[in-house]
Amino acid sequence: MTRRVGAIVACVDANGRVLLVRQRGGPFAGAWLLPGGGVEEGESLEDAVRRETREETGCELAQLAHVATYEVDETVEDFRALVHLYRGTAVGEARAEDGSAVRWSAPDGPGYHAALRRELADAGLRREDDAGLARALDTTNVTMRRVDR
């Protein structure tokens, strides 16, 4: 199976909260994750993350910076992606697209998917014990390997 290319962003507001989107479908259905999605043909990574954030949340992005790149594999739905993580500042009022939900949350909140915890830690927004996080990821059907170090 071909590895898809995606871009996601840790959008932070003036209060240090991070913008999350409830996933409607796919391997992460029901989970609260960072906004983002697939990169379209001919589109840059930055343009893709800006477009996806605007579509999913209504927000624009400022101060966008690349943080990390991961190979992500999910075994149940055979999802494979190369995901580029950005960090930026959200501009505008957050609103969900039809059938979805968005919320501002503390980056160190409880109950987050292990993949989100890894991303927030790499973006410098959350402290995590690497061994504990690796064990948490092992309990999911998702593997994440950072490939930019």
Predicted regions and their residues:
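Conserved Nudix-box catalytic region and its N-terminal flanking loop in Nudix hydrolases
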Residues: 17-55
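Active-site-adjacent beta-strand/loop module that shapes the phosphate/pyrophosphate-binding cleft
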Residues: 70-94
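Short connector loops at helix/strand junctions that flank enzyme active sites
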Residues: 2-4, 34, 65, 79-83
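Conserved N-terminal beta-strand and adjoining loop/helix that marks the start
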Residues: 1-18, 69, 87
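Flexible, glycine-rich phosphate/dinucleotide-binding loops
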Residues: 18, 27, 73, 92-94, ...
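A short coil-to-beta-strand element that immediately follows conserved catalytic motifs
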Residues: 59-68
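Short loop segments at secondary-structure junctions
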Residues: 13-16, 24, 89-93, 107-108
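Nudix hydrolase/Nudix homology domain
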Residues: 31, 95-149
